[in-house]
Design a protein with these regions (language model features):
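Specific transmembrane alpha-helical segments of multi-pass solute transporters/efflux pumps
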Residues: 24, 28-29, 57-108, 144, ...
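Hydrophobic/aromatic residues within transmembrane alpha-helices
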Residues: 35, 44, 48, 95, ...
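Hydrophobic transmembrane alpha-helices of multi-pass small-molecule transport proteins
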Residues: 56, 127-147, 260, 280-299
């Protein structure tokens, strides 16, 4: 009974961490939308990741001391973050540039399927009809909350690249937890954020060398500084930390269910700034919530059931 209560408490805490993570993450969308009016996409992502990394390193130094930073597995964390979060985020951007926002959003909405497939293949997770029904509701709810018009969907190489992006992000989240079991969530987040920052810096300098668009850096205004801190510290640093904590508690499959609810969170944030309420997104969020609960619920066992083993 005690173990059951501990499991339920861990699941509740994990789901709460995922919700907080997605809430913080969603603040990045309106901030980025405003910054991209003057900033180049490559320069903005590179600076955002650098500021987020410095924030996490500072937080680590404050919590455990500067000396402990030398003991972290920086090289291993770099490569997990480089491939999982760095390449994954860039591939999603490439997918949108090759198709449209609808197709990229559909590819991102498949992340729960990719995440569950990883758990089945690598962790031996057993699927039940109840869990699969929950996954179906989560995907349906996310598509509804996103307001996607399927008539705009384009199947092709761009969509397949988007699927790869979702798979890499799911793999990176799982690898951050499973590959660094000896570390606390904050340390896991910090070492892998280094890899994500390194990849985006590599892309930025490559774009500079080849004189590609998206590298312009304007003279920052006071408003830019505020938005950059929101985008880097809140939508990346705190969000990624809470996200890794949640993944460690409920697994990447269930955690990914929360991530695709971001459009609903963004709507709530924009509502504060005077934008309208969308019942379609609200209904989608409700469907998604039912799916999350269903996927984690366990059927009641018959307490009077007897063992089938021979005496």
């Amino acid at each position: 009974m005690l173990n059951k209560l501990k499991t339920q408490s861990s699941a509740a805490s994990g789901n709460l961490n995922c919700m907080v993570a997605v809430g913080f993450f969603s603040f990045g969308f309106p901030a980025a939308n405003s910054l991209l009016e003057t900033w180049g996409v490559f320069s903005l992502i590179a600076l955002r990741n650098l500021l987020g990394l410095l924030f996490l390193i500072g937080l680590m130094a404050f919590k455990v001391g500067v000396g402990s930073l030398n003991q972290l597995p920086w090289i291993k964390g770099f490569w997990v973050g480089f491939f999982g979060f760095g390449i994954g985020s860039m591939l999603l951007l490439l997918s949108q540039s090759m198709t449209n926002a609808v197709t990229a959003a559909l590819a991102a909405a498949t992340m729960p399927i990719c995440a569950v497939a990883l758990e089945v293949a690598l962790d031996g997770k057993r699927l039940t009809l109840r869990f699969l029904a929950g996954v179906a509701l989560v995907v349906l709810g996310s598509l509804t909350a996103s307001g996607i018009q399927f008539s705009d969907f384009q199947f092709g190489l761009g969509f397949l690249i988007g699927l790869c992006a979702s798979s890499l992000f799911a793999w990176g989240s799982r690898a951050t937890v499973k590959g660094f079991l000896e570390l606390k969530p904050l340390a896991r987040t910090t070492v892998t954020t280094l890899g994500m920052t390194g990849f985006c810096a590599f892309v930025f300098f490559g774009a500079l060398i080849f004189k590609m668009p998206g590298t312009n850096i304007p003279t920052p205004t006071d408003n830019d500084f505020i938005l950059l801190l929101i985008y880097a510290w809140c939508a990346l640093g705190l969000s990624q930390w809470m996200w890794i904590r949640g993944v460690g508690q409920v697994g990447i499959g269930v955690a990914s269910f929360h991530l695709i609810a971001a459009p609903f969170y963004v709507m709530l944030i924009m509502l504060v700034f005077g934008y309208g309420w969308s019942w379609l997104q609200a209904i989608g969020a409700c469907i998604l919530a039912v799916g999350v609960i269903m996927a984690q619920s366990q059927p009641k066992r018959d307490s009077t059931a007897k063992s089938t083993h021979s005496p």
